A protein has these predicted regions:
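Alpha-helix capping and helix-loop boundary segments enriched in small/acidic/polar residues
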Residues: 4, 66-70, 94
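Non-catalytic ligand/cofactor/substrate-binding and regulatory segments of enzyme domains
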Residues: 1-13, 138-143, 151
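Low-complexity, Gly/Ser/Thr/Pro-rich intrinsically disordered linker/tail segments
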Residues: 129-166
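Hydrophobic/aromatic-rich core segments of domains that either
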Residues: 74-144
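Secondary-structure boundary elements
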Residues: 3-64
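Secondary-structure capping and boundary motifs in well-ordered enzyme cores
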Residues: 57, 64-71, 75
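Short, solvent-exposed positions on alpha-helices
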Residues: 28-32, 73, 114
Length: 166
């Protein structure tokens, strides 16, 4: 089963790249295109969370890419897989937001690291908005911006001190 899903996830990553990435895109544009694809195609598993039980698949890239339902770590694992395939350095970050555990990513563009939280940029996180227009509140942000809402052990991750996109 792992091999079958591994191949299917890899195939989906390739399909995403083929559908949203153009040859002349900059890495910034690639990151934005994948961010937007995730928001338009993956639904936050709000209903399972509300019921008090989130199935393990919602925590995985498989959940995000094949089932198209995930929570934060599923979004983040899937985003990281696509970035790796595009050869854009990307880290999986764990921490919290408020009193709840949370996961997001860091990406490296032009030699500098930035935070990116696809989950929190998804406008249907509360299960009500069907617009699917991406937010950019947590798109390529510095640690100083992220620390206002996200808590993490900075020493475990690259420094994100560029304020270029803040």
């Amino acid at each position: 089963e792992v091999t079958v899903y591994g191949k299917a996830v890899g195939k989906r990553v390739n399909q995403i790249i083929k559908s949203v990435i153009k040859k002349d895109m900059t890495n910034y544009q690639k990151v934005q295109a994948v961010h937007n694809w995730m928001i338009r195609n993956v639904k936050y598993d709000y209903y399972s969370l509300k019921r008090g039980y989130v199935p393990s698949v919602s925590h995985t890239a498989k959940g995000a890419l094949l089932k198209k339902v995930a929570v934060c770590d599923g979004y983040s694992h899937a985003f990281q897989m696509v970035m790796r395939k595009l050869k854009i350095p990307c880290r999986f970050v764990t921490g919290s937001s408020g009193s709840v555990g949370h996961a997001w990513n860091m990406v490296k563009l032009s030699g500098k690291w930035y935070h990116i939280d696809v989950t929190f940029d998804d406008p249907i996180i509360n299960g009500t908005n069907t617009n699917k227009k991406p937010y950019y509140t947590y798109f390529l942000k510095s640690s100083s911006v992220m620390k206002k809402t996200h808590h993490f052990t900075a020493s475990k991750y690259p420094t994100c001190n560029s304020k270029k996109y803040d």
